[in-house]
A protein has these predicted regions:
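Helix-coil boundary and interhelical linker segments in multi-pass alpha-helical membrane proteins
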Residues: 1-7, 44, 48-61, 101-117, ...
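Structural motif at transmembrane-helix junctions in multi-pass transporters
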Residues: 28-33, 77-94, 110-112, 116, ...
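Glycine-rich segments within core transmembrane alpha-helices of 12-TM secondary carriers
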Residues: 94-101
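Membrane-interface interhelical linkers
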Residues: 1-68, 74-86, 133-148, 179-217
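Functionally critical, cavity-lining and gating residues within the transmembrane helices
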Residues: 73-74, 101, 157-158, 216
Length: 217
């Protein structure tokens, strides 16, 4: 597959991800939005799991761990956007996770990054952190801590998913089951409260939730 095509796909994925987070931030019922998104993921990936082999017990453990980490990540995102602006939280969480992954991959995994590659990652992450910096606004300590915790969750589930894909005889087995189940914690949370979540939805939330669910995977 040509490298430019992979690069183009990654750009589209990044744009879709940014749109999803913008929808999440500027919504008065973000938990409901996540609940609808989780339902969309279930509807999309349930038919697909019938076309792949069942996961092994070891893969099941990784899939369950990934689902829990994704659940924590999504809840942290909600709280992060409650205490911090999108322009503050998003660059820190994304830049921080990239830096963590680069460090962990270099030290503990077989993936080796060249010195120039590592410096490039540092420069990009530094640029992302600068986007969040503002002289006008007081430093948002709570938002910063939540953004860092979000970055930790992103790095954690990315590592788990990377291991799962590599340990699968059929990579789609892990991928489809992971995408089917990773929204279940958020779905459960969205059903637990009376005044927010899936118990309080309207047409506008439904449309945005379906759009989110299509873009998110």
């Amino acid at each position: 597959m040509p490298e430019y095509f992979i690069f183009f796909v990654l750009l589209i994925a990044a744009l879709s991800h940014a749109i999803c987070h913008s929808l999440l931030k500027h919504n008065n019922n973000p938990l409901g939005l996540l609940g609808i998104t989780s339902l969309c993921e279930i509807l999309i990936f349930t038919p697909l799991v019938f076309y792949v082999p069942l996961p092994t017990p070891y893969l099941w453990s990784l899939i369950i761990l990934s689902a829990l980490l994704h659940g924590l990540y999504r809840m942290l995102v909600l709280y992060s956007y409650r205490f911090g602006d999108l322009s503050f939280v998003y660059p820190i969480s994304r830049g921080g996770s990239s830096l963590l992954l680069a460090i962990i991959s270099t030290i503990y995994l077989t993936d080796k990054i060249s010195l120039f590659g590592f410096l490039a990652i540092l420069i990009i992450c530094f640029g992302l952190f600068l986007i969040s910096y503002s002289k006008k606004n007081k430093f948002n300590r709570i938002g910063f801590i939540l953004a860092l915790l979000t970055a930790l969750m992103i790095a954690s589930y990315t590592l788990v998913d990377g291991i799962g894909i590599r340990q699968s005889e059929n990579a789609y087995t892990y991928l489809y089951w992971m995408l089917l189940l990773n929204g279940t914690p958020a779905l459960i949370a969205s059903l637990m409260f009376k005044n927010i979540g899936l118990r309080k939805i309207n047409k506008d939330l439904l449309i945005k939730g379906i759009s989110f669910g299509i873009l998110a995977p």
